[in-house]
Amino acid sequence: TVTQAFDDYDPTRAARAIEDFTSEQLSNWYVRLSRRRFWKGEMQEDKQAAYDTLFECLRVISQLMAPVSPFFSDWLYRSLTSPASAGITDSVHLSNFPVSQPQNIDSELEETMQVAQDLCSMVLSIRKKEKIRVRQPLSRIMVPIANEQFRQRLKHVESLILSEVNVKELHYLEEDNEVLVKTLRLNFKALGPRAGAQMKAIQEKAKHLTQADIRKLEQEGKIALQLADGDFELMLGETEILAQDIPGWQVAVNGNLTVALDITLNDALLSEGRARDLVNRIQNMRKDQGFQVTDRIRIEWQADEAFAAVIAAHADYICAEVLAEEILQCDDPALDFFDIDGLRVGLRLALAPSPATN
């Protein structure tokens, strides 16, 4: 795409393609999902692979952007490479422009990852609509399975999806399930030029489409409607498919993808959500106090009975996430106080004593 844009003397299109890949695919997806791989203690094979992939992406990006961002691209290239390395030049402008290697493209993996991205986006949009923060865990999502290929793709990225949207379980629904009921609405603007005088008859026929008919339209992208003056082929893009909400759930539809999210919150989920909010608050305090990423810390806290129960239930998780050696309750009005989900909590952080000083 970038090479073709430059060949067409269209640097704007090339720059936008680079920006989209860097922002959406690399930063907002790969880097964010690989954070735990980067943070692993020892340089094991998986951690090395994560860094190697990121390095290769950044190196190629520096070369792709060189014609439109000569100074920054050269700084990035020099920061990543060493002239002493084999095949590495002193400047990005002395290196060869990258050549696409289509033999390395794994189309099945790309399509599988697209399913993951689309489903995550749909679930997160429901959270936003319902004003449920992402740090608040939810119990389950349901996804109708169109075919065996889709099932296998979903299984491949199930754990990734659940982690990204902070949901406990993913339930697979067969397409003939009676849990999710879909309705079809015609897109008159898209359909009008082609339907003409048949519009009223098409509208009447569309009202009587069954769940099986709607599934066929989703899977095949079209469906034949038998009208009085002959068949009319209704296209998926000329319709809008909606799903009826289930009590306690919210449903989203995007093309042939449907997902239902259980938005019911119980005490256990609320407790875990508050623990995650506390971790976020402690991480921000670590940063504000200038602690290093690897520093071990000591936490002192004060809270009412409700939040004390949260800390007691999730102390191990909290300590592991923020690198705390101790998390101790105290009674000191000099702590930093703030609210979490309407509950008042006080905190104080300090560096944990090193083993040599114990």
Write out the residue ranges for each language-model feature.
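Feature 926 captures the class I aminoacyl-tRNA synthetase adenylation module centered on the KMSKS loop
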Residues: 1-358
